[in-house]
């Protein structure tokens, strides 16, 4: 059981592992079904298509490697594959999160209530429908914050040498932070915490959030496991919210 008051900081690895445990809790599983279905349908189809295209995309990406780096091609090839998986995985997980955002918010709310014993607002299906415009506005805020930064990093991929060495590392770090924002935002948004204030709060536990986001990013690239990662990450992020942020930011007790 996660405490409802602020506790000593734990690692992002801990909260990620908690997500796997919490997602199977009795009473929670029914709120997991819809996010899970969205993720299975979208990510399953997307990665099936991706693996049919890799033999075209990877040689194209490797063609940008300058002659003086050709001797490292045996190392750059797996980096190129990982780069494609990172970019592709993050792109489609973002789409899946847009579609499932109302259900992810409900999952975070119900899990928080069970972890803390607090009484959440009376939502239900009607409440979710009323909240959809606000939730979509929040997703749009995240997208606007993310897009210009992602474009800059994607441009780096087309710079010979940099695109095959530095860019993948920067993209991984960026996607780790962005996935931490994506999943931690659900419990924050349930309490109407502004997007900017939420980002400021996450920076107080930046290492833990980077660890959490990095693991989420890695599992997003792994076939089969990436089909269930969405509800797992929501549960893990909600546990982190309860331990680290709820005492200061909670709207309902």
Curated annotation (Swiss-Prot):
**Primary location:** membrane
Q: Which residues span the membrane?
A: 31-51, 75-95, 151-171, 222-242
- Database matches in Pfam families: EI24
Keyword check for Cell inner membrane: yes
Q: How does it sit in the membrane?
A: Multi-pass membrane protein
* GO CC annotation: plasma membrane
GO terms in the biological process aspect are:
cysteine biosynthetic process; sulfate assimilation
Its localization reads:
Cell inner membrane
The record's listing under InterPro entries reads:
CysZ_sulfate_transptr, Sulfate_CysZ
Protein keywords = Amino-acid biosynthesis, Cell inner membrane, Cell membrane, Cysteine biosynthesis, Membrane, Sulfate transport, Transmembrane, Transmembrane helix, Transport
GO MF, one term, reads: high-affinity sulfate:proton symporter activity
The question of whether Ligase is a record keyword is answered with no
The family annotation for this protein states: Belongs to the CysZ family.
NCBIfam families on file: PRK04949.1
> Per its database record, what is this protein's job?
High affinity, high specificity proton-dependent sulfate transporter, which mediates sulfate uptake. Provides the sulfur source for the cysteine synthesis pathway.
User: What is the protein named?
Assistant: Sulfate transporter CysZ
Organism, per UniProt?
Answer: Citrobacter koseri (strain ATCC BAA-895 / CDC 4225-83 / SGSC4696)
Q: Which gene encodes it?
A: cysZ
